[in-house]
Structure formats: structure tokens, C-alpha cells
Amino acid sequence: MRQFDRHQGLVAPMDRANVDTDLIIPKQFLKSIKRTGFGPNLFDELRYLDEGYPGQDVAKRPLNPDFVLNQPRYQGASVLLARRNFGCGSSREHAPWALEDFGFRVIIAPSFADIFFNNAFKNGLLLITFDEATVDRLFQEAEAEEGYRLDVDLEKQQVTTPSGEVLTFEVDPFRKHCLLEGLDDIGLTLKDADAIEDFEARHRQARPWLFRQAG
């Protein structure tokens, strides 16, 4: 998992509440268990005018010109500004995979679905919650100012706007530690590899009958 310390990125405002995981990455693209390759089909039903299917050449598909991520001013966006209850629906881990693969590092919204919230942090995304009034103001600024960028400092837990306004956000200390160190569940386990091996050796010595092969 990539480390997250500080990120400055272009903001894409997605003005839609209750965006569910099926809208983030439709079910027909869930056959793969790899973490990469989902970016081209992120928000597939909103980005394209035709129906998508696995293996399709997305370069030949007609784009929806009204969708925010297809508009030239938001190309290269890495901060997604969203509305309440983002990530609701089924608990597919492919949703944060698709967002990360597309290039997003930060998502800001008034609220997130619990399971999506947990999955996103475990896959290197920083999710930030602000109250509705603050999010409304960020939407207004991002839509009014082309090239609107936010500076996100995880260590200080601050978001700085182009005008210099500093917004402070809360983050669970353990999740913050994992992002700063780039540790997912596997990485956390491997940090204790020596202790695990030591336990296994002592366990085998103390209870050898558990390890005898039948025959």
C-alpha cells in the first residue's frame, strides 16, 4: 500500500448523494480479484453512454459529456468531493480499488457508508468528513474556480484551500498510522513476522503431537 503523508490535488466535485458501490464499479466488472485495472470502469454507467462489459476497449466508447470526470477542467483530478452517504450498498472491495486505480487519493464528503469507509482506508485512500455547510462551500468554490486544488496534510490533519483557509479534520489514530507508514493488513502482519515465527517454534516444541503426521 502506498504511503500517504501530504497530497496536493485537483478537485472533482461529484454533486450526487447516496452514491452506492454498484455505481462506483458495476457488478459485471467484479470477476477479477486483482487490485488494478478497474480505473477505466470507475462510475461506468455515468461516464459512458453505452453499456459496459469486461474486456471492452473503453477508448472506443462514447463518453457522457455531462459527467464531471469527462469534463476537460477536471482531467487529472485526485481529490473527489462528494455528497452524503458515499459508498453505500454492497461491501465490494473493488470500489476503493477502482477509485485508487483511477488516481484518487482523497475523498471528502459529509458522511460515508461504514463498510466502504473501512475498505477505503485499508486500500490507501484518505477519507475526510466535514459538515454539510463546509462541503457545500467547497462545492461552490470548486465549481466556480477552474483548477481548484486542495492541499491535504495527514500528519497535521489539515486541508488548505487555494484562498489559504485551513480546515481541520479528524482521523482515527490507528488508520492515520497505517496510511503514514503505508501498511495494509498484510503489511501489519509482516511487521510481526519474527514474533510469529518465534511463537510457532515454541508452540511446535511444547505440543509436538499436534504436528505429527498420521500414517
Swiss-Prot record:
The reaction(s) this protein catalyses: (2R,3S)-3-isopropylmalate = (2S)-2-isopropylmalate
UniProt keyword terms in alphabetical order: Amino-acid biosynthesis, Branched-chain amino acid biosynthesis, Leucine biosynthesis, Lyase
GO molecular function: 3-isopropylmalate dehydratase activity
GO cellular component, one term: 3-isopropylmalate dehydratase complex
Pathway noted in the entry: Amino-acid biosynthesis; L-leucine biosynthesis; L-leucine from 3-methyl-2-oxobutanoate: step 2/4
Enzyme Commission number(s): 4.2.1.33
Key word Amino-acid biosynthesis present: yes
Keyword Amino-acid biosynthesis: yes
Pfam families recorded: Aconitase_C
Transmembrane parts of this sequence: none
Enzyme class: lyase
Highest taxon listed in the record's lineage: Bacteria
Single biological process term from Gene Ontology: L-leucine biosynthetic process
InterPro entries: 3-IsopropMal_deHydase_ssu, Aconitase/3IPM_dehydase_swvl, AconitaseA/IPMdHydase_ssu_swvl, IPMI_Swivel, LeuD
Biological role stated in the UniProt entry: Catalyzes the isomerization between 2-isopropylmalate and 3-isopropylmalate, via the formation of 2-isopropylmaleate.
Family membership noted in the UniProt record: Belongs to the LeuD family. LeuD type 1 subfamily.
Subunit structure: Heterodimer of LeuC and LeuD.
Protein name: 3-isopropylmalate dehydratase small subunit
